């Protein structure tokens, strides 16, 4: 026997002994659970942030883009290319074969398009190949040129209306407002120390706000005074800065500021303002933007807790809902809002700043009547008996349009048809005049001590753009480029009297190049970290505030990187990189989910009459905004078998405070103490005894561990190891 063969035999013998020892050791070891808490909620699927989002894109997102872009008409409006349907074919290779061949795991996308000649009435329908579209594997990755890539979810500021304040050198509060759409022109309001209010349109030069109000159609001084109840700040703006006297003057003045150097006319100014704000193709709120606008600009949030100075009557019936002198609860304020009432008068306390004879600044509070204007949106469920989601209505609707529909419809079928037909009017995708007037009213109300400024770092004001939405945005860019090409071809071929077909008009190159560009060069499209199963899983659950439309690491301040109370159970306070990206890249917590608007939710058990509901089917998922003000018990609070609290005082959390309250005041309870941490941090045994800096390093270094050839169970574990391995699907 040669030395080499002897070495091989010895090696095999050692392996057999080791294998036998491992088997006998594993059969002897019994897992002991030292946890004091039983009945913790089972972890959700840990890669669903990726898979669910891509599934939404395939089923709904891609169709939304087609419906937004089509129909495409030529300049004479004689030809129209309409969208009928779209589908994915089977992929040429499966994911494994794509890796072997260094190919893209993709499926052909086909769209059925209809070309209508309005002159002749001729209609041609055919299926058009729209390019190969990359598909997501079951494990939440894409295979591009044989390599697995992950699209990292992006954490961005949500579209909405945000108010802030700063103090001038005399200590006076100066307010600012920013109206942010998902896509389109920004509106920014600001005031100076002389109580003059300005507006910036699309980050251009500032304009007196009364000039802007006139340009929108409220032309004379009397109309402005009537609409905003003789507000002294608007009066000061008119006296000191506004030289215009009617709508025509204001339109020309606005156009000069927005388009300096171009000849100003009333028509061109009207067209420009209409394109900036009231064209759904240029100004897009999306569902989440409309939700945030309605939440902020509804009349209820400003009326609650204030005393009415005039009676409030239902416009439709004339019935007095509430008399003057009533201090409104939130439910009563919601009743006023859902009755379609856009304005009400309440008692307010405004600050007035004086300089005393000794030269000191003095503040006096003066009681006054303030007018509150809302945006006229109501809950449609209060007016119809059927579910409107199937009709395309999932948000609050414009009361004026709903009233028209209700008055004209004579049967339920007619009502359903009218609601479906006018869904875009009921829930506008762009900003409307009522929204703009409500934003100005809120700004003036803040000066009178009504309403609150916003915390921009609160997770209720930040949302997740996950893979489906990022792909949809890229797809829309490609389609917008393609739309121009189609329109030009329509005109050329119509002039040459060529035989037109949908295939001849469509050029797919802009769409395919936009998608390739995204997967190849976007900072959010990254090679998957494949050191070990944990590295793969955390990469798919990563949240980045960087990337297009996000922050830049050079300009991001301390506040945006810091841990915020609203991160609890949503974003891990521990796992983040060291170095320039600290706080800008983070990880989802173990139980966190993303709702259909893109806001992060975390689960809680309900607590009613001091009894915790231990049924896992009755868990409630709340976003950071919904959780505000709630008193939430800790997940390790000791309970009796019937779900009642053992102790007569319970440690709780309420926003940024940690009160100790009797059980009767507790509203919700954490589902598990692990809820606060990410997957990597949850794998650290006895995490609560670790120093935070060491835990941060540990959770990052676990991703760099070299995996064993033959995997072993950990001697000390936290109980989630099995699911981490299963969900990483390696």
Please report, for each region that a protein language model flagged, where it lies by residue:
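Flexible, glycine/threonine-enriched loop-and-boundary segments that flank and lead into catalytic domains
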Residues: 124, 542-573, 715-729
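Active-site proximal loops enriched in glycine and acidic residues that flank catalytic Cys/His/Asp
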Residues: 575, 586-589
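N-terminal non-catalytic structural scaffold regions of very large proteins
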Residues: 2-541, 589-708
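Hydrophobic beta-strand positions
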Residues: 312, 573-574
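Edge strands and adjacent loops of beta-rich recognition modules
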Residues: 701-722
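Short beta-alpha junctions and helix-cap segments that line functional grooves
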Residues: 97, 130, 137-139, 559-560, ...
């Amino acid at each position: 026997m040669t030395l080499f063969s002897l070495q091989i035999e010895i090696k095999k013998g050692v392996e057999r002994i080791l294998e036998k020892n491992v088997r006998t050791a594993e059969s002897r070891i019994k897992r002991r659970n030292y946890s004091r808490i039983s009945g913790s909620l089972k972890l959700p699927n840990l890669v669903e942030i990726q898979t669910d989002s891509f599934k939404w894109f395939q089923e709904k997102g891609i169709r939304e883009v087609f419906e937004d872009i089509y129909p495409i008409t030529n300049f004479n409006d004689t030809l129209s290319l309409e969208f009928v349907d779209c589908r994915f074919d089977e992929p040429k290779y499966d994911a494994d074969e794509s890796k072997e061949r260094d190919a893209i795991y993709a499926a052909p996308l086909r769209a059925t398009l209809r070309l209508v000649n309005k002159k002749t009435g001729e209609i041609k329908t055919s299926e058009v190949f729209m390019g190969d579209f990359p598909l997501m594997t079951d494990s939440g990755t894409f295979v591009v040129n044989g390599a697995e890539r992950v699209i990292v979810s992006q954490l961005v500021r949500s579209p909405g209306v945000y108010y802030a304040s700063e103090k001038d050198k005399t200590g006076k509060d100066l307010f600012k407002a920013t109206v942010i759409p998902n896509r389109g022109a920004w509106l920014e309001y600001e005031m100076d120390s002389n109580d003059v209010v300005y507006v910036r349109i699309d980050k251009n030069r500032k304009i007196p706000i009364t000039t802007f109000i006139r340009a929108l159609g409220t032309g004379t001084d009397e109309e402005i005074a009537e609409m905003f109840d003789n507000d002294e700040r608007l009066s000061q703006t008119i006296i000191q800065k506004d030289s215009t006297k009617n709508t025509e003057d204001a339109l020309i003045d606005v156009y000069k500021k927005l388009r300096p150097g171009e000849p100003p006319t009333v028509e061109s100014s009207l067209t420009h303002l209409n394109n900036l704000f009231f064209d759904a193709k240029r100004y897009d709120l999306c569902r989440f933007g409309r939700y945030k606008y309605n939440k902020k600009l509804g009349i209820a949030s400003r009326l609650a807790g204030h005393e009415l100075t005039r009676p409030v009557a239902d416009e439709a019936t004339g019935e007095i809902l509430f008399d003057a002198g009533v201090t409104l609860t939130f439910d009563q304020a919601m009743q006023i809002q859902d009755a379609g009432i856009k304005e009400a008068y309440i008692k307010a306390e405004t600050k007035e700043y004086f300089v005393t004879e000794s030269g000191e600044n003095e503040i006096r509070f003066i009681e006054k009547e303030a007018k509150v204007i809302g945006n006229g949106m109501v809950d449609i469920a209060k007016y119809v008996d059927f579910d409107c989601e199937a009709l395309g209505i999932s948000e609050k609707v414009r009361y004026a349009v709903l009233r028209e529909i209700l008055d004209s419809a004579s049967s339920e079928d007619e009502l359903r048809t009218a609601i479906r037909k006018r869904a875009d009017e009921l829930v506008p995708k762009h900003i409307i005049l009522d929204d703009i007037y409500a934003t100005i009213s809120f700004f003036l109300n803040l000066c009178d001590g009504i309403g609150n400024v916003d915390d921009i770092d609160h997770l209720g004001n930040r949302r997740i753009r996950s893979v489906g939405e990022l792909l949809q945005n890229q797809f829309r860019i490609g389609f917008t480029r393609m739309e121009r090409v189609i329109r030009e071809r329509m005109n050329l071929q119509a002039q040459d009297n060529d035989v037109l077909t949908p295939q001849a008009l469509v050029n797919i190159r802009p769409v395919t190049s936009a998608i390739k560009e995204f997967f190849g060069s976007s900072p959010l499209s990254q090679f998957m970290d494949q050191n070990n199963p944990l590295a793969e899983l955390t990469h798919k659950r990563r949240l980045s505030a960087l990337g297009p439309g996000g922050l830049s690491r050079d300009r991001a301040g301390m506040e945006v990187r810091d841990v915020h109370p609203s991160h609890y159970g949503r974003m891990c306070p521990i796992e983040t990189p060291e170095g320039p990206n600290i706080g800008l890249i983070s990880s989802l917590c173990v139980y966190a989910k993303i709702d259909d608007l893109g806001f992060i939710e975390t689960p809680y058990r309900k607590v009613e009459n001091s009894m915790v509901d231990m049924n896992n089917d009755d868990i409630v998922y709340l976003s950071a905004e919904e959780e505000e003000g709630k008193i939430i018990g800790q997940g390790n609070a000791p309970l009796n078998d019937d779900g009642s609290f053992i102790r007569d005082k319970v440690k709780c959390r309420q926003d940024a405070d940690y009160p100790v309250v009797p059980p009767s005041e507790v509203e919700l309870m954490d589902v598990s103490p692990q809820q606060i941490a990410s997957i990597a941090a949850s794998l650290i045994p006895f995490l609560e005894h670790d120093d935070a800096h060491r835990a941060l390093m540990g959770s990052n270094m676990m991703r760099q561990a070299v995996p064993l050839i033959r995997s072993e169970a950990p001697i000390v574990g936290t109980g989630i190891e099995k699911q981490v391995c299963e969900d990483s699907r390696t």
